[in-house]
């Protein structure tokens, strides 16, 4: 199943780059030397660049990062799909359309960002335990700040979750299928 998630991510990023090219869009991010990323394109000089911004592209990682520290800290086994989802690429968060709803996939910008993600994931899992709800792993944000898209750690399904209340609906049987259904959209600056 993890190979299917990798393949779906590769195809999704290819679709993103195709949309960017077709729409003559340049992905860019405000440059902060203290928040560097392997995604930044060195010496990017493009007429579309905003002042203080630098062009970037998603970068495939050499190896998938591990969530073993979370598993050890919380005595939980995480669905292996989540390590592939967050550990295959470095990228800015990616806007996409799913069933005509605009969402934003949470992605990892750098190794430091991966550490921050792990801290947030631990806090999320601890909150789920406190609320006596099944463990979920967030993967995307929604327009409604009280909703997230998450991976159900028990079933492996992709679900919509209302924060504090739990799972409200199943969106896809697994992460690969969910990613395959995404349509890239241009981010708003």
Where are these regions (language model features)?
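Short, solvent-exposed coil/turn segments at beta-strand boundaries
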Residues: 132-135, 151-157
């Amino acid at each position: 199943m993890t190979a299917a998630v990798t393949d779906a991510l590769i195809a999704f990023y290819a679709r993103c780059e195709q949309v960017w090219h077709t729409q003559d869009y340049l992905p860019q991010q405000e440059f902060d030397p203290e928040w560097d990323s392997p995604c930044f394109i060195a010496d990017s000089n493009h007429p579309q660049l905003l002042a203080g911004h630098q062009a970037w592209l998603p970068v495939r990682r050499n190896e998938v990062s591990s969530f073993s520290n979370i598993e050890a800290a919380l005595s939980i086994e995480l669905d292996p799909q989540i390590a592939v989802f967050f550990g295959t690429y470095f990228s800015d968060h990616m806007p996409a359309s799913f069933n005509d709803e605009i969402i934003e996939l949470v992605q990892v910008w750098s190794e430091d960002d991966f550490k921050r993600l792990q801290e947030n994931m631990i806090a999320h899992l601890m909150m789920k335990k406190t609320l006596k709800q099944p463990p979920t792993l967030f993967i995307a944000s929604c327009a409604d700040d009280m909703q997230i898209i998450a991976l159900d750690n028990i079933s492996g399904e992709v679900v919509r979750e209302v924060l504090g209340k739990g799972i409200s609906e199943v969106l896809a049987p697994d992460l690969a299928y969910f990613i395959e259904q995404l349509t890239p959209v241009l981010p708003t600056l």
